[in-house]
Amino acid sequence: AVMGRNLALNIESRGYTVSVFNRSREKTEEVIAENPGKKLVPYYTVKEFVESLETPRRILLMVKAGAGTDAAIDSLKPYLDKGDIIIDGGNTFFQDTIRRNRELSAEGFNFIGTGVSGGEEGALKGPSIMPGGQKEAYELVAPILTKIAAVAEDGEPCVTYIGADGAGHYVKMVHNGIEYGDMQLIAEAYSLLKGGLNLSNEELAETFTEWNKGELNSYLIDITKDIFTKKDEEGKYLVDVILDEAANKGTGKWTSQSSLDLGEPLSLITESVFARYISSLKEQRVAASKVLSGPKAQLAGDKAEFIEKVRRALYLGKIVSYAQGFSQLRAASDEYNWDLNYGEIAKIFRAGCIIRAQFLQKITDAYAENAGIANLLLAPYFKKIADDYQQALRDVVAYAVQNGIPVPTFSAAVAYYDSYRAAVLPANLIQAQRDYFGAHTYKRT
């Protein structure tokens, strides 16, 4: 409801009159009462709401993904005319969007599955928008979407046509998977600095403030520096009294499931999903901590040197995560015939969304230089970072393993990097085993 309200206010602020409807009359009245003088026109029946709109009608749905979306569409259909456009701005599973697009197209309606990132504030002030569907339908809503989207530093709006049917929601799903990876990498960096150097929250805030001035400049690093110094009403650091169980809404899981369907090694992002799952086993972990032994963390040596190693490891880990995510976008584009433009996708992530970061421009540049590049690690800029920073990543992972500090995504980054650069892997033995017990055959070198 908050995302829908804020998007309606965003659209209204760009000079449009917006018809609003919610199943709950109270919620509709609440929005109108809270925003006097705004060009928001309330309707209390679907029929009146639909009939209030100019044709071709442009209807933005912001409902909980799943059966609720189907129910909302079914309630609209009796009052729609051919050529009307429904925009689904929810966190919808892309296969559902493909199905709805097919079904509505057959009835003469247009359907645009649209990823919207930026949270409640982004919805109000300008989100990153990822629309997918019929190109001609997109052209009819592009003026509105362009006006409400976030604007990057170079003045470009953070919206672009992504591709047919489920492409927009797929890109949003992968965006969310990358977000999981970013957040887990940052959490592991925090754990290393706390466990390896006993940094205070003030020192952590100072460290992240410095990091945010360089290559790691991003929304997530920026908010993390603020989180470290936030205190509760009792004067305690808030981060220290928050239970160490990270919840999830399932979009990271969808990204990992899709990687398995496509045969894509999305190891870092998948580890970040599993890290949330293991965090939720709090009771088991507390019990296991009293039974299972392991090394006690020793201090990591020179403070400035270790902080720099963790910074480098974090940046290279982030690069590996995005390399995996964009590799998966390529595989999905081939599988679903979407013809995705990866440089444009990186561009619209530069503002408005949760993963917005300075280094996304480097991804756009890499694809501008070589649109067909198989993996971002092969692009000159990212190859140089890997050359220069891999020792720091290896040192940090080795330190963590020796000192019993779990770093699943840092470890996944090293494993993926070494596997990807290996001309020969021991998979020949696995294939021999498969042939031995199951006559699966094999190829000769």
UniProtKB/Swiss-Prot annotation:
InterPro entries, sorted: 6-PGluconate_DH-like_C_sf (IPR008927), 6PGD_dom2 (IPR013328), 6PGDH_C (IPR006114), 6PGDH_Gnd/GntZ (IPR006113), 6PGDH_NADP-bd (IPR006115), 6PGdom_BS (IPR006184), NAD(P)-bd_dom_sf (IPR036291), Pgluconate_DH (IPR006183)
Binding residues for substrate: N91, S117, G118, G119, H175, N176, Y180, K249, R276, R434, H440
Record-linked SMART domains: 6PGD
Molecular-function annotations in GO: NADP binding; phosphogluconate dehydrogenase (decarboxylating) activity
GO BP terms, alphabetized: D-gluconate metabolic process; organic acid catabolic process; pentose-phosphate shunt
EC number, as in UniProt: 1.1.1.44
Record's keyword annotation contains NADP: yes
SUPFAM superfamilies associated with the record: 6-phosphogluconate dehydrogenase C-terminal domain-like, NAD(P)-binding Rossmann-fold domains
Tagged with keyword Oxidoreductase: yes
Group of enzyme by EC: oxidoreductase
Effect of E206D: In strain: CT42
Catalytic activity: 6-phospho-D-gluconate + NADP(+) = D-ribulose 5-phosphate + CO2 + NADPH
Alphabetized UniProt keyword annotations: Gluconate utilization, NADP, Oxidoreductase, Pentose shunt
Family the entry assigns: Belongs to the 6-phosphogluconate dehydrogenase family.
Quaternary structure, from the entry: Homodimer.
Family matches, as NCBIfam families: gnd, PRK09287.1
Name of the protein described by the UniProt record: 6-phosphogluconate dehydrogenase, decarboxylating
Source organism phylogeny: Bacteria, Pseudomonadati, Pseudomonadota, Gammaproteobacteria, Enterobacterales
